Curated annotation (Swiss-Prot):
Binds to the 23S rRNA. Keywords: Ribonucleoprotein, Ribosomal protein, RNA-binding, rRNA-binding. Gene3D superfamilies: Ribosomal protein L9, C-terminal domain, Ribosomal protein L9, N-terminal domain. It comes from Pediococcus pentosaceus (strain ATCC 25745 / CCUG 21536 / LMG 10740 / 183-1w). This is Large ribosomal subunit protein bL9.
Length: 150
């Protein structure tokens, strides 16, 4: 019997797959527990429509990430942060990714989750620093952060 998996079933199939399984297994376990449904022509065409909609939605998200990347990588987009520093240019403390995210939101009205800012170590010196920001699985932008003395 052909079924469409509604969720992942270990060893049998993943969500959205159409597979042939034994009749008893399909009726007594998969369909009864809501893990799959019979693969009728209407159900298969509905699945294709869902996959198209998901692909379109994913393409829109990718396009939005690309637009945001061009805005962030613009030469005029420099995140200004003021901090107390010593005479040698080293900061008292450091600038973590949370502070960069709040400064970006205040200055440019762009809200980015602090976990998407990929700062290996907090910024501890004054001057310009290039910081990578992962906007999407396939899109990574680089923003310039300028740390000035307070």
């Amino acid at each position: 019997m052909k079924v469409i998996f509604l969720e992942d079933v270990k060893g049998k199939g993943k969500r959205g797959e159409v597979k042939n399984v034994s009749d008893g297994y399909a009726q007594n376990f998969l369909i009864k527990n809501g893990k799959a449904k019979a693969a009728t022509s209407a159900a298969v065409s509905e699945l294709k429509g869902q996959k198209k909609a998901e692909a379109k939605h994913e393409a829109e998200i990718l396009a939005d990430a690309e637009k945001l990347k061009t805005v962030l990588e613009n030469d005029k987009t420099v995140v200004e942060i003021k901090a107390k520093a010593g005479k040698d240019g080293r900061l008292f403390g450091s600038i973590p990714n949370k502070q960069i995210a709040t400064a970006l939101e205040k200055q440019y009205k762009i809200k980015i989750d602090k976990r998407k800012i990929e700062l290996s170590n907090p910024i501890r010196s004054m001057g310009y620093t290039n910081v990578p920001v992962k906007l999407h699985q396939k899109v990574t932008a680089t923003i310039r952060v300028h740390v000035a003395e307070q």
